[in-house]
Regions:
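Bacterial N-terminal signal peptides
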Residues: 11-25
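N-terminal secretory signal peptides that target proteins for export/translocation
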Residues: 1-9
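Short alpha-beta junction capping motif
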Residues: 55, 118-163
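Surface-exposed patches in mature extracellular/periplasmic domains of secreted proteins
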Residues: 102-112, 154-159, 177-185
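An acidic, glycine-rich "communication" segment
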Residues: 36-39, 63-70, 162-243, 247-248, ...
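Aromatic-Pro/Gly-enriched surface loop or interdomain linker
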Residues: 28-123, 129-130, 241-244, 248-276
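Extracytoplasmic/secreted envelope proteins and their assembly/folding machinery
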Residues: 89-93, 139, 143, 163-167, ...
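A generic secondary-structure signal for well-formed alpha-helical elements
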Residues: 100, 150, 170-177, 273
Length: 276
């Protein structure tokens, strides 16, 4: 009988603890930015700082119906667009500041396709793009953004099924523009760093599994969509996870060569986008 009472008391305390954690999580979410590994704040002054370059991350509605933080298709229960956010963004911005002369805002910017605000930002990054969905109005706005000089970099989707779902959305946006494999001599790989020789950049899972690939994405694909003048308007990083490499560059167990390659690719893409 005494053992049963102890068991019931332990179960009650466990339930109260879970409820308390849930309430704390909701409070943190209401007070500031919250993501899968904690809270990340920045000052109002930083978020309003004027610059020539803004790191912009695309917030989209996923196939699970999620656009804000919340449970749905994504990583760790978070909406897919927010994977690695915001640590990957912040760490990449530190590298951009140190290694280029681009005058940039030190914090990230979230952009949506439901307003014309996206036209204020020259370069946009999107992840988990196998899960994105667009309304006709959103697809039209993204198409106009790209054809008027914008640049989109997509990352962190893997294998055949992810590619097919990504292309459903991409064909809404640019139905008449072909996708091409980029050659090693393409200008985008040489505007800042010479990246004629590249390799697959895995996510954090490499530390525990030793695998550089996810799903059936065994071979990295460097692809692009160009406008009628030949300018790359969509840079496609398929079968790799550059954002994870940026995020975990300070993790001793994550190999430096992967992080270094990921940063160089991102920096090249930004310099290309800002000069074309």
């Amino acid at each position: 009988m005494q053992l049963q009472r102890r068991f019931r008391m332990a179960a009650l305390l466990l339930g109260l603890g879970c409820a308390l954690l849930t309430l704390c999580g909701l409070a943190a979410y209401a007070q500031g930015r919250f993501y899968s590994r904690g809270r990340y704040d920045y000052s109002d002054a930083q978020s309003q700082e004027k610059a020539e370059f803004y790191w912009s991350r695309l917030r989209y509605t996923s196939s699970g119906g999620q656009s804000n933080f919340g449970f749905g298709f994504g990583y760790g229960g978070w909406a897919g667009w927010s994977r690695d956010y915001p640590k990957a963004d912040r760490q990449f911005l530190m590298a951009l500041k140190r290694l280029t002369r681009i005058q940039m805002r030190p914090v990230e910017q979230i952009v949506d396709l439901d307003s014309d605000e996206i036209f204020n930002y020259p370069w946009v990054y999107a992840v988990q793009v196998a899960n994105w969905t667009f309304t006709d109005a959103q697809a039209k706005r993204l198409r106009e953004y790209l054809l008027k000089g914008g640049f989109l970099m997509v990352d962190d989707f893997h294998g055949t099924a992810d590619w097919d779902r990504f292309m459903v959305g991409m064909r809404q946006v640019l139905p008449d523009r072909p996708v091409e494999d980029l050659g090693d001599n393409d200008e985008i790989f040489h505007v800042l760093y010479d990246l004629g020789e590249r390799f697959q950049v895995p996510g954090e899972q490499y530390v525990n599994t030793g695998r550089t690939y996810e799903k059936d994405g065994y071979v990295p694909k460097w692809r692009a969509i160009r406008d009628e003048k030949g300018r790359i308007i969509v840079a496609i990083c398929h079968n790799m996870h550059l954002g994870d490499a940026w995020e975990w560059a300070d993790m001793p167990e994550y190999p430096e060569n992967f992080a270094s390659m990921a940063y160089r690719i991102g920096l090249n893409y930004i310099v290309y986008g800002m000069t074309h």
